[in-house]
Amino acid sequence: MFDIKVLALDLDGTLTNDQKLVTPRTRAALDAAIEKGVTVVLASGRPTAGIQPLAEELGLDKKGGCILSYNGGKIVDCRTGETLVEKTLDPALVPELCAFAAAQDIAILTYNREGIVCERDKDEWANKECFTTKLPMIHVDDLASYVNYPVCKMLITLDPARRDAVCAAGQQQFAGRADLYPSSPFFIEAVPLGVAKDGSLAELLRRMGLTRETLMACGDGLNDRSMIAYAGVGVAMQNAEQPVKDCADYVTTADNNHDGVAEAVEKFILRED
């Protein structure tokens, strides 16, 4: 018998299907879990504004719950709007990250309150972030000089064939100053050193007076590995990358297009036996 109190859910490739929708069965499972007193945390690399509409669709602004955005860079209480955790990049790294992307001839973007900010606003891979977050693309001529405010992360977007080589080069250049890691075939996250979903969830659990044994985490991407390994019950989607499956306690038989999250919630939270 599992005593899950907190349910952390990655969004893209996990909670939502490939059309970025939450299916009726999954929605019903989440509603039932919330009714049992489980706190739902939407845990994503997306910016906060790119998660807010889904949180409201699920009723977390009224029922309670949290948004964990920027891969753990920020946690917001859905009901009160209070920022519980926030970690930002060293401002000196912003121009260096922009120069790194320019040298690789690839796009890099970040966010403001209105949307996604990028020099290469027509870039195919950068525009995938618009589709994912439902946020508009804002073109600027010089991203490094435009960003005069704290940012929780920057996102490098590129052809999947180049991802691993570029990521390795970035990890070498920014070692000890920022963490770079892939979050999808065409995205590389650049976040403050040590920021990851597991650390921010640990901080949230401490605030709630809970232990990691009460946490269930579901995900599919490499940026989900830390929280899946950390959670009392770590769940990988059937469509997850193999390293994610390797660190999970359970791999769903269904993928994100066939209610994989519902399968896990029904098995570990709703089942009475």
What are these regions (language model features)?
Residues 24-125:
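Active-site phosphate-binding/coordination module
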Residues 2-6, 23, 189-273:
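Mg2+-dependent phosphoryl-transfer enzymes with acidic/Ser/Thr/Gly-rich catalytic loops
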Residues 100, 104-218, 222-226, 230:
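Conserved acidic, metal-coordinating active-site core of Asp-based
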Residues 57-61, 85-86, 125-129, 197-198, ...:
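Short, hinge-like loop/turn segments at secondary-structure boundaries
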Residues 58, 63, 71, 174-176, ...:
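Short, structured coil segments at secondary-structure junctions
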Residues 26, 51-55, 166, 170, ...:
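Hydrophobic packing residues within well-ordered alpha-helices of enzyme cores
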Residues 37-41, 63-65, 153, 213-214, ...:
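Short active-site oxyanion
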Residues 3-19:
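Asp-based phosphoryl-transfer active-site loop
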